[in-house]
A protein has these predicted regions:
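A conserved, positively charged/aromatic
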Residues: 117-146
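A short, glycine/small-residue-rich beta-strand->loop->alpha-helix junction that serves as a flexible
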Residues: 7-22, 125
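Histidine-centered beta-alpha loop that forms part of the nucleotide-sugar donor binding/catalytic region
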Residues: 8-9, 60, 98-100, 120-123
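Short, well-ordered alpha-helix to beta-strand connector turns
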Residues: 31, 52, 91-92, 113, ...
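An aromatic- and histidine-rich active-site surface loop
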Residues: 77-80, 94-112, 127-128
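N-terminal strand-loop element at the rim of the active site
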Residues: 6-13, 26-72
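Residues at the starts of beta-strands that form the adenosine-phosphate
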Residues: 3, 33-35, 115, 143-144
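Short N-terminal targeting/anchoring amphipathic segment
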Residues: 5, 73, 83-101, 117
């Protein structure tokens, strides 16, 4: 059975982690083995009682200073890019990228020849240049966009 490696940048109680929680809960009930990589705290922590879910977390939060927020974002992308290579020799792995933001693990997944699936929640073309760039990257890296 396919192992799902799921990446979500910021685990809080907003819409995208709540939607992801519903999706992952359905997959967990079907018996899929899921590795969840996300920040500490939030709605996704409610899945931790499933034995077939393993969570890897990192500290991430927003700052009032946009430069600090972007530095933190880039650091998480580098961390998750490197972390992703732990699944290099696993067969039957799908990288599930929740939202546009986790571009580091999506890039690593493509480099390793893994299947990359994006769950696209937001309309990037109303959010600004940064999100438009991320949407373009998603279109190049994704095998499938949900």
């Amino acid at each position: 059975m396919t192992r799902i490696i799921c990446f979500h940048l910021f685990n809080d109680y907003s819409g995208s982690p709540k939607v992801l929680k519903i999706v992952l809960e359905g997959l967990l009930k079907k018996g899929y083995q899921i590795n969840l990589i996300t920040s500490t705290g939030g709605a996704l922590d409610e899945l931790l009682y499933y034995k077939n879910l393993s969570k890897h977390s990192y500290p991430y939060r927003f700052s009032n200073n946009p430069i600090v927020t972007m530095l933190r974002y880039y650091m998480v992308q580098l961390y998750t890019f490197i972390l992703t290579f732990r699944w290099l020799f696993y067969k039957d792995v799908t990288f599930y990228i929740n939202t546009l933001l986790p571009v580091g693990p999506a890039l690593a997944g493509r480099i390793m020849g893994k299947r990359v699936v994006y769950h696209y929640h937001e309309n990037a073309f109303v959010k600004g240049t940064f999100y438009k760039v991320l949407a373009t990257i998603m279109q190049k890296l994704a095998h499938k966009i949900i």
